[in-house]
Amino acid sequence: HTNYSYIYQTSLQDASGILNSSREDVLQLRGSATLFKKITDRQNAFFRAWYGSTSNDVSYSGTSPYDNDFSDMYAGAALGYNFSDKMWNVSADVALQWEKNKINDLSVEEFYPLINLSAGFSPSKKHSFRTYFHFGANYPGASEKTPNVLQQNELMYYTGNPNLGLSRQITFNLSYNWMPVNAFSASAFVQYFGEFNLYVPVFNPYNDGKALLRTFETDCDYNRTQIGMSFNYKLLNGNLQLAASPSVSLYRVSGLFDIKRSPFYCNASATYYLGNFYFQASYQTRSLTVHGNRGVIYKDRNFYQMLAGWSRS
Protein backbone atom coordinates (compact mmCIF):
# COMPACT_ATOMS: atom_id res chain seq x y z
CA HIS A 1 0.00 0.00 0.00
CA THR A 2 1.34 3.47 -0.92
CA ASN A 3 0.08 7.04 -0.67
CA TYR A 4 1.46 9.77 -2.93
CA SER A 5 0.76 13.51 -3.12
CA TYR A 6 1.96 16.08 -5.65
CA ILE A 7 1.31 19.77 -4.97
CA TYR A 8 2.12 22.52 -7.47
CA GLN A 9 1.67 26.19 -6.58
CA THR A 10 2.36 29.15 -8.86
CA SER A 11 2.94 32.81 -8.01
CA LEU A 12 0.70 34.02 -10.86
CA GLN A 13 -2.32 36.04 -9.86
CA ASP A 14 -5.72 34.29 -9.80
CA ALA A 15 -4.02 30.91 -10.40
CA SER A 16 -5.14 27.95 -8.33
CA GLY A 17 -2.78 25.24 -7.11
CA ILE A 18 -2.62 21.71 -8.51
CA LEU A 19 -3.07 18.76 -6.17
CA ASN A 20 -2.69 15.16 -7.34
CA SER A 21 -3.07 12.52 -4.63
CA SER A 22 -3.11 8.78 -5.18
CA ARG A 23 -3.78 5.74 -3.04
CA GLU A 24 -2.52 2.41 -4.38
CA ASP A 25 -3.12 -1.12 -3.10
CA VAL A 26 -0.94 -3.84 -4.64
CA LEU A 27 -1.43 -7.60 -4.47
CA GLN A 28 1.20 -9.96 -5.90
CA LEU A 29 1.19 -13.73 -6.33
CA ARG A 30 4.15 -15.72 -7.69
CA GLY A 31 5.04 -19.38 -7.90
CA SER A 32 7.40 -21.69 -9.78
CA ALA A 33 8.41 -25.34 -9.92
CA THR A 34 11.57 -26.93 -11.35
CA LEU A 35 12.44 -30.49 -12.35
CA PHE A 36 16.18 -31.23 -12.54
CA LYS A 37 17.76 -34.18 -14.36
CA LYS A 38 21.45 -35.13 -14.16
CA ILE A 39 22.40 -36.82 -17.43
CA THR A 40 26.12 -37.36 -16.80
CA ASP A 41 28.75 -35.80 -14.55
CA ARG A 42 29.17 -33.08 -17.18
CA GLN A 43 25.59 -32.66 -18.39
CA ASN A 44 22.25 -31.83 -16.83
CA ALA A 45 18.84 -30.60 -17.95
CA PHE A 46 15.85 -28.96 -16.31
CA PHE A 47 12.20 -28.10 -16.86
CA ARG A 48 10.71 -25.06 -15.15
CA ALA A 49 7.15 -23.69 -15.03
CA TRP A 50 5.96 -20.47 -13.40
CA TYR A 51 2.96 -18.24 -12.84
CA GLY A 52 2.56 -14.75 -11.46
CA SER A 53 0.04 -11.95 -11.14
CA THR A 54 0.07 -8.36 -9.93
CA SER A 55 -3.05 -6.34 -9.18
CA ASN A 56 -2.96 -2.57 -8.66
CA ASP A 57 -6.01 -0.70 -7.39
CA VAL A 58 -5.27 3.02 -7.83
CA SER A 59 -7.50 5.90 -6.72
CA TYR A 60 -6.66 9.50 -7.67
CA SER A 61 -8.10 12.52 -5.90
CA GLY A 62 -7.55 16.26 -6.09
CA THR A 63 -7.36 18.17 -9.36
CA SER A 64 -7.72 15.03 -11.53
CA PRO A 65 -9.85 12.40 -9.72
CA TYR A 66 -9.89 8.86 -11.19
CA ASP A 67 -10.28 5.24 -10.14
CA ASN A 68 -8.39 2.53 -12.04
CA ASP A 69 -7.77 -1.20 -11.77
CA PHE A 70 -4.51 -2.49 -13.27
CA SER A 71 -3.60 -6.16 -13.48
CA ASP A 72 -0.78 -8.15 -15.05
CA MET A 73 -0.75 -11.95 -15.31
CA TYR A 74 1.92 -14.18 -16.80
CA ALA A 75 2.72 -17.87 -17.07
CA GLY A 76 5.39 -19.84 -18.87
CA ALA A 77 7.51 -22.94 -19.17
CA ALA A 78 11.18 -23.46 -20.06
CA LEU A 79 13.53 -26.27 -21.05
CA GLY A 80 17.22 -25.91 -20.22
CA TYR A 81 20.51 -27.74 -20.76
CA ASN A 82 23.99 -27.33 -19.25
CA PHE A 83 27.35 -28.84 -20.19
CA SER A 84 30.75 -28.23 -18.60
CA ASP A 85 34.23 -29.73 -18.69
CA LYS A 86 37.79 -28.44 -18.31
CA MET A 87 37.57 -26.18 -21.38
CA TRP A 88 33.86 -25.64 -22.11
CA ASN A 89 30.90 -24.30 -20.18
CA VAL A 90 27.66 -24.18 -22.19
CA SER A 91 24.17 -23.26 -21.00
CA ALA A 92 20.93 -22.90 -22.98
CA ASP A 93 17.27 -22.52 -22.16
CA VAL A 94 14.19 -21.81 -24.28
CA ALA A 95 10.84 -20.72 -22.88
CA LEU A 96 7.37 -19.76 -24.03
CA GLN A 97 5.56 -17.17 -21.94
CA TRP A 98 2.00 -15.83 -21.93
CA GLU A 99 1.27 -12.40 -20.52
CA LYS A 100 -1.97 -10.45 -20.12
CA ASN A 101 -2.02 -6.78 -19.21
CA LYS A 102 -5.37 -5.25 -18.25
CA ILE A 103 -6.51 -1.73 -17.39
CA ASN A 104 -10.14 -1.52 -16.31
CA ASP A 105 -12.03 -3.24 -19.17
CA LEU A 106 -9.26 -2.96 -21.79
CA SER A 107 -6.75 -5.83 -22.03
CA VAL A 108 -3.79 -6.83 -24.20
CA GLU A 109 -2.31 -10.34 -24.19
CA GLU A 110 0.49 -12.05 -26.10
CA PHE A 111 2.53 -15.24 -26.34
CA TYR A 112 6.25 -14.74 -26.89
CA PRO A 113 9.48 -16.79 -26.72
CA LEU A 114 12.38 -16.30 -24.32
CA ILE A 115 15.85 -17.53 -25.28
CA ASN A 116 19.08 -17.55 -23.24
CA LEU A 117 22.35 -18.95 -24.61
CA SER A 118 25.80 -18.69 -23.02
CA ALA A 119 29.13 -20.36 -23.68
CA GLY A 120 32.61 -20.13 -22.22
CA PHE A 121 35.80 -21.58 -23.71
CA SER A 122 39.17 -21.67 -21.92
CA PRO A 123 41.81 -23.54 -23.95
CA SER A 124 44.50 -22.57 -21.40
CA LYS A 125 45.03 -20.43 -18.33
CA LYS A 126 46.19 -17.58 -20.58
CA HIS A 127 43.18 -17.40 -22.89
CA SER A 128 39.42 -17.45 -22.36
CA PHE A 129 36.36 -16.58 -24.44
CA ARG A 130 32.84 -15.83 -23.28
CA THR A 131 29.60 -15.16 -25.18
CA TYR A 132 25.99 -14.59 -24.21
CA PHE A 133 22.72 -14.15 -26.15
CA HIS A 134 19.26 -13.22 -24.88
CA PHE A 135 15.97 -12.72 -26.69
CA GLY A 136 13.02 -11.48 -24.68
CA ALA A 137 10.26 -8.93 -24.34
CA ASN A 138 9.21 -6.09 -22.09
CA TYR A 139 5.80 -4.72 -21.16
CA PRO A 140 5.30 -1.02 -20.38
CA GLY A 141 4.41 -0.18 -16.80
CA ALA A 142 1.11 1.05 -15.42
CA SER A 143 2.11 4.72 -15.63
CA GLU A 144 2.79 4.38 -19.37
CA LYS A 145 -0.59 2.69 -19.96
CA THR A 146 -2.89 4.70 -17.70
CA PRO A 147 -5.87 6.37 -19.43
CA ASN A 148 -5.93 9.17 -16.83
CA VAL A 149 -5.06 12.76 -17.71
CA LEU A 150 -3.11 14.37 -14.85
CA GLN A 151 -2.19 18.05 -14.79
CA GLN A 152 1.41 18.77 -13.79
CA ASN A 153 1.45 22.56 -14.22
CA GLU A 154 -0.16 25.30 -16.33
CA LEU A 155 1.47 24.05 -19.52
CA MET A 156 1.78 20.27 -19.15
CA TYR A 157 -0.65 17.36 -18.81
CA TYR A 158 0.33 13.67 -18.60
CA THR A 159 -1.50 10.57 -19.78
CA GLY A 160 -0.67 7.06 -20.97
CA ASN A 161 -1.71 4.75 -23.79
CA PRO A 162 -3.67 1.61 -22.80
CA ASN A 163 -2.99 0.08 -26.24
CA LEU A 164 0.78 -0.16 -25.79
CA GLY A 165 2.07 -3.68 -26.33
CA LEU A 166 5.29 -5.62 -25.98
CA SER A 167 8.69 -4.47 -27.14
CA ARG A 168 11.24 -7.11 -28.22
CA GLN A 169 14.73 -7.16 -26.76
CA ILE A 170 18.00 -8.67 -27.97
CA THR A 171 21.24 -8.76 -25.97
CA PHE A 172 24.56 -10.13 -27.27
CA ASN A 173 27.94 -10.09 -25.52
CA LEU A 174 31.29 -11.44 -26.70
CA SER A 175 34.54 -11.10 -24.73
CA TYR A 176 38.12 -12.35 -24.86
CA ASN A 177 40.57 -12.34 -21.94
CA TRP A 178 44.34 -12.72 -22.23
CA MET A 179 46.74 -13.10 -19.28
CA PRO A 180 50.22 -14.03 -20.56
CA VAL A 181 51.87 -13.32 -17.18
CA ASN A 182 50.64 -12.49 -13.70
CA ALA A 183 51.74 -8.87 -14.10
CA PHE A 184 49.74 -8.15 -17.26
CA SER A 185 46.21 -8.86 -18.46
CA ALA A 186 44.07 -7.55 -21.31
CA SER A 187 40.54 -8.06 -22.55
CA ALA A 188 38.44 -7.08 -25.54
CA PHE A 189 34.67 -7.09 -25.78
CA VAL A 190 31.67 -6.35 -27.98
CA GLN A 191 28.23 -5.71 -26.48
CA TYR A 192 24.95 -5.18 -28.32
CA PHE A 193 21.51 -4.30 -27.02
CA GLY A 194 18.47 -3.73 -29.23
CA GLU A 195 14.86 -3.02 -28.38
CA PHE A 196 12.21 -2.91 -31.10
CA ASN A 197 8.66 -1.52 -31.20
CA LEU A 198 9.60 0.58 -28.20
CA TYR A 199 7.23 3.24 -26.84
CA VAL A 200 8.34 6.89 -26.86
CA PRO A 201 6.80 10.10 -25.45
CA VAL A 202 4.68 12.17 -27.83
CA PHE A 203 3.62 15.76 -27.12
CA ASN A 204 0.41 17.15 -28.63
CA PRO A 205 -1.50 20.45 -28.23
CA TYR A 206 -4.11 20.29 -25.46
CA ASN A 207 -6.76 22.48 -23.85
CA ASP A 208 -7.40 24.51 -27.03
CA GLY A 209 -3.69 24.88 -27.67
CA LYS A 210 -2.98 26.43 -24.27
CA ALA A 211 -0.99 23.44 -23.00
CA LEU A 212 0.74 20.21 -24.06
CA LEU A 213 -0.42 16.64 -23.48
CA ARG A 214 2.31 14.02 -23.15
CA THR A 215 1.31 10.51 -24.11
CA PHE A 216 3.13 7.46 -25.52
CA GLU A 217 3.19 5.82 -28.94
CA THR A 218 4.95 2.73 -30.27
CA ASP A 219 7.41 4.32 -32.70
CA CYS A 220 11.04 3.49 -31.95
CA ASP A 221 13.80 0.99 -32.66
CA TYR A 222 16.78 1.34 -30.31
CA ASN A 223 20.26 -0.06 -31.02
CA ARG A 224 23.38 0.26 -28.88
CA THR A 225 26.72 -1.37 -29.74
CA GLN A 226 29.78 -0.97 -27.53
CA ILE A 227 33.30 -2.03 -28.50
CA GLY A 228 36.11 -1.76 -26.00
CA MET A 229 39.28 -3.05 -24.39
CA SER A 230 40.83 -3.02 -20.93
CA PHE A 231 44.42 -3.32 -19.74
CA ASN A 232 46.02 -3.95 -16.35
CA TYR A 233 49.79 -3.83 -15.79
CA LYS A 234 51.76 -4.26 -12.55
CA LEU A 235 55.28 -2.83 -12.16
CA LEU A 236 57.88 -2.62 -9.39
CA ASN A 237 56.90 -5.97 -7.86
CA GLY A 238 53.22 -5.00 -7.96
CA ASN A 239 53.67 -1.70 -6.12
CA LEU A 240 52.69 0.31 -9.21
CA GLN A 241 49.46 -0.68 -10.95
CA LEU A 242 48.31 0.86 -14.23
CA ALA A 243 44.82 0.37 -15.71
CA ALA A 244 42.97 1.70 -18.75
CA SER A 245 39.57 0.92 -20.33
CA PRO A 246 38.87 2.67 -23.67
CA SER A 247 35.63 2.02 -25.55
CA VAL A 248 33.34 3.46 -28.22
CA SER A 249 29.54 3.20 -28.25
CA LEU A 250 27.35 3.32 -31.37
CA TYR A 251 23.82 4.58 -30.68
CA ARG A 252 21.22 4.35 -33.43
CA VAL A 253 17.61 5.33 -32.71
CA SER A 254 15.00 5.34 -35.49
CA GLY A 255 11.36 6.38 -35.55
CA LEU A 256 9.97 9.56 -34.06
CA PHE A 257 13.37 10.39 -32.54
CA ASP A 258 16.12 9.99 -35.15
CA ILE A 259 19.34 9.91 -33.12
CA LYS A 260 22.86 8.84 -34.09
CA ARG A 261 25.78 9.20 -31.70
CA SER A 262 29.20 7.52 -31.44
CA PRO A 263 30.84 8.68 -28.19
CA PHE A 264 34.32 7.62 -27.10
CA TYR A 265 34.92 6.85 -23.44
CA CYS A 266 38.08 6.04 -21.49
CA ASN A 267 38.84 5.41 -17.84
CA ALA A 268 42.51 5.34 -16.76
CA SER A 269 44.19 5.11 -13.36
CA ALA A 270 47.59 4.70 -11.73
CA THR A 271 48.00 3.42 -8.17
CA TYR A 272 51.23 3.27 -6.18
CA TYR A 273 51.64 1.35 -2.90
CA LEU A 274 54.29 2.43 -0.39
CA GLY A 275 54.07 0.21 2.66
CA ASN A 276 50.66 0.76 4.20
CA PHE A 277 50.14 3.96 2.19
CA TYR A 278 48.68 4.23 -1.31
CA PHE A 279 48.42 7.06 -3.84
CA GLN A 280 46.08 7.05 -6.83
CA ALA A 281 45.41 9.30 -9.80
CA SER A 282 42.47 8.60 -12.10
CA TYR A 283 40.76 10.23 -15.06
CA GLN A 284 37.66 9.46 -17.09
CA THR A 285 36.38 11.22 -20.18
CA ARG A 286 32.93 12.71 -20.48
CA SER A 287 30.25 10.07 -20.94
CA LEU A 288 27.26 10.26 -23.28
CA THR A 289 24.18 8.03 -23.02
CA VAL A 290 21.10 7.84 -25.25
CA HIS A 291 17.81 6.74 -23.67
CA GLY A 292 15.64 5.38 -26.46
CA ASN A 293 12.25 5.34 -24.76
CA ARG A 294 12.68 8.99 -23.76
CA GLY A 295 14.42 10.36 -26.82
CA VAL A 296 16.94 11.99 -24.48
CA ILE A 297 20.72 12.38 -24.68
CA TYR A 298 22.57 12.59 -21.36
CA LYS A 299 26.05 14.12 -21.19
CA ASP A 300 28.31 13.94 -18.17
CA ARG A 301 31.51 15.86 -17.47
CA ASN A 302 35.15 14.83 -17.43
CA PHE A 303 36.28 13.49 -14.08
CA TYR A 304 39.66 13.83 -12.36
CA GLN A 305 40.57 12.36 -8.99
CA MET A 306 43.62 12.27 -6.72
CA LEU A 307 43.61 9.98 -3.69
CA ALA A 308 45.99 9.26 -0.84
CA GLY A 309 45.27 6.84 1.94
CA TRP A 310 46.47 4.36 4.49
CA SER A 311 45.26 0.83 5.10
CA ARG A 312 46.43 -2.09 7.16
CA SER A 313 45.10 -5.63 7.02
Map each language-model feature to its residues.
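Eukaryotic acidic, serine/threonine-rich low-complexity intrinsically disordered regions
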Residues: D14-S16
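Exposed, low-structure sequence patches enriched in small/polar residues
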Residues: H1-Q9, I18-S313
